[in-house]
Design a protein with these regions (language model features):
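Glycine-rich phosphate-binding active-site loops on the catalytic face of alpha/beta enzymes
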Residues: 30, 130-136, 152-184
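Conserved, mostly hydrophobic/aromatic
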Residues: 20, 85, 126, 163
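Glycine-rich beta-to-alpha transition loops that act as phosphate-gripper elements at the mouths
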Residues: 10-14, 58-63, 82-85, 104-107, ...
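Conserved N-terminal beta1-alpha1 strand-loop-helix module at the mouth
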Residues: 1-56, 60-63, 77-79
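Short, acidic/polar
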Residues: 9-21, 64-71, 108-119, 156-160
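Ordered, amphipathic secondary-structure segments that act as subunit-interaction surfaces
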Residues: 64-88
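Conserved beta-strand positions in the central sheet of alpha/beta enzyme cores
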Residues: 29, 53, 82, 100-101, ...
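Alpha-helix-loop-beta-strand connector modules within alpha/beta enzyme cores
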Residues: 39-58, 74-76, 86, 90-102, ...
Length: 184
């Protein structure tokens, strides 16, 4: 599985990657990169003993399906995948690569479907978005068969603390300074 790190930053540019590599953090989520650049991103991270979770739906120039997942895992050697697509989660698991199922909670129906998908797919983790739904997912946090993550709309360390104290295992943030400022 992934290294222990409560707050995982999302890295979207080479400049942000360079800043990330100056921190002691061991893992990040890569998104918004073009497929041609993603291999370099992963190589740079691995050279510095960092792990990369690839958000497959937000990689430019790649189909975000099971074949795209297979390419990222087998040829680019991503350490984990994050996706809202069941076929991608299944492909990651088939390749013994950690899989994070991203769920967007828009209403009670999407919450119910997300819980059902989590039970069926058995991902290594499930990430709920936006993070503000954490009071609604409290029952699932206790009974989830995997780690429960939250992401989206996280503005400060106080919000991270609220989430982790409610049972959320990990939090994803788009602001690297939040990841480096968090002290458990």
């Amino acid at each position: 599985m992934l290294p222990s790190q409560t707050v995982i930053p999302v890295i979207t540019t080479m400049k942000a990657l360079e800043r990330f590599l100056e921190t002691p953090l061991p893992v990040f989520i890569a998104q918004d990169f073009h497929l041609n650049l993603l291999g370099n991103v992963i190589e740079m991270a691995h050279a510095r003993h960092r792990q990369v979770i690839v958000h497959i739906e937000l990689i430019q120039g790649l189909a975000s399906d099971e074949f795209g997942a297979q390419h990222i895992i087998q040829h680019l050697h991503a350490d984990a995948l994050i996706s809202s697509k069941p076929k991608v989660i299944e492909m990651a698991k088939k390749n013994k690569t950690p899989a994070i199922l991203r769920l967007f909670v828009l209403d009670s129906k999407s919450l119910k479907r997300g819980i059902e998908l989590t039970q069926t797919l058995k991902p290594d983790a499930v990430e709920f978005m936006p993070s503000l739904v954490y009071p609604l997912i409290a029952p699932m946090i206790q009974s989830a068969p995997c780690e429960v993550w939250a992401g989206g709309l996280i503005r400060d360390v106080a919000m991270i603390l609220t989430l982790t104290q409610s049972g959320i295992t990990r939090v994803t943030v788009s602001d690297l300074s939040l990841a480096t400022a968090y002290q458990p």
